[in-house]
């Protein structure tokens, strides 16, 4: 059985908190298959945003990234896991 792991990372005050998160994205870059950034842009550029990460590789290493991101100020991490044969 394979697992398809996706993290949703909510970032508040992204201009202040993204640099630390970006450092972790770089460190774990080989485990990030897809990265999608979302933020509100109508009438203004929102200071808050959402990043979706489709993970790849060793599950322990992927979960390690989630723990490190969640430990950063201004970030919240939610996990989705889909299993399939």
Model-derived features: positions:
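Long, contiguous binding/interaction regions
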Residues: 1-85
């Amino acid at each position: 059985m394979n697992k398809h792991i996706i993290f949703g990372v909510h970032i508040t005050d992204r201009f202040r908190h993204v640099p630390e998160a970006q450092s972790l994205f770089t460190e774990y870059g080989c485990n990030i298959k897809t990265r999608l950034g979302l933020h509100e842009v109508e009438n203004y550029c929102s200071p808050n945003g959402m990043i979706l990460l489709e993970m790849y590789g060793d599950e322990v290493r992927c979960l390690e990234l989630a723990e490190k991101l969640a430990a950063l100020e201004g970030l919240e991490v939610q996990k989705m896991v889909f299993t399939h044969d």
